[in-house]
């Protein structure tokens, strides 16, 4: 093998190694930022056990909202068709947050309860992530979920 071929081979190996390293770093960064959506039924079945951080979606159970008098700490129960999960959140809740309203909380399980670091309330009558709409369609005791509910991925 002559010197020119050896140098060319060396550059090809370096470029491929750098590309592989870049792809690996991108994949790890994306995995760390992914947040999966689970319903209370899936959480109680243990499907969310392997995830440090995930989203919990469902309806706020009527009468379950309890606010601490001396802080911004709020606890409430998120329900779906078969299960309920207790949620704790410290912070200012969205204006649309109330009983029997669709909610998505981002956080982690801690000691049998979900500790949220972010709470999102349904912003209008047509918004609901498709997977949450499908999971909630059978058990929602309030108003029916419209068939025209906009999926999360649909452009607005």
Curated annotation (Swiss-Prot):
Entry's localization field: Cell inner membrane
**Keyword Membrane (UniProt):** yes
Which purpose does this protein serve, as stated in its record?
A: Heme chaperone required for the biogenesis of c-type cytochromes. Transiently binds heme delivered by CcmC and transfers the heme to apo-cytochromes in a process facilitated by CcmF and CcmH.
Q: How is this protein named in the record?
A: Cytochrome c-type biogenesis protein CcmE 1
**GO terms (BP aspect):** cytochrome complex assembly
Q: Which NCBIfam families match?
A: PRK13159.1, PRK13254.1-1, PRK13254.1-3, PRK13254.1-5
Top-level taxon in the UniProt lineage: Bacteria
Listed A to Z, the keywords are:
Cell inner membrane, Cell membrane, Cytochrome c-type biogenesis, Heme, Iron, Membrane, Metal-binding, Signal-anchor, Transmembrane, Transmembrane helix
Q: Which organism is it from?
A: Xanthomonas euvesicatoria pv. vesicatoria (strain 85-10)
Q: Specify the protein's topology with respect to the membrane.
A: Single-pass type II membrane protein
GO CC annotations, alphabetized: plasma membrane
- Segments spanning the bilayer are 9-29
* Positions of heme binding: 123, 127
In which family does this protein belong, per the annotation? Belongs to the CcmE/CycJ family.
The molecular function terms of the Gene Ontology recorded here are: heme binding; metal ion binding
Please note every region of biased composition (Low complexity). 146-156
Give residue spans on the Periplasmic membrane side: 30-156
Q: Which residues form a coiled coil?
A: none
User: Which lineage is the organism of this entry classified under, starting from the top rank?
Assistant: Bacteria, Pseudomonadati, Pseudomonadota, Gammaproteobacteria, Lysobacterales
- List cystine links: none
């Amino acid at each position: 093998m002559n010197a020119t071929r050896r140098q060319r081979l060396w550059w090809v190996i370096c470029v491929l190694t750098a590309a592989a390293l870049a792809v690996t770093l991108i994949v790890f960064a994306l995995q760390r930022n992914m947040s999966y959506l689970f319903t209370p039924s899936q959480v109680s079945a243990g499907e969310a056990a392997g995830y440090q951080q995930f989203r919990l979606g469902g309806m706020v159970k009527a009468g379950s909202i309890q606010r601490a008098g001396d802080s911004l700490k709020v606890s409430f129960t998120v329900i779906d068709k078969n299960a309920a999960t207790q949620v704790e959140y410290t912070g200012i809740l969205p204006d649309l947050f109330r009983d029997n309203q669709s909610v998505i909380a981002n956080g982690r399980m801690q000691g049998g309860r979900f500790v949220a670091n972010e709470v999102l309330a349904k912003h209008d009558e047509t918004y609901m992530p498709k997977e949450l709409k499908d999971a909630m369609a059978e058990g929602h005791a309030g108003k029916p979920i419209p068939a025209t509910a906009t999926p999360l991925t649909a452009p607005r």
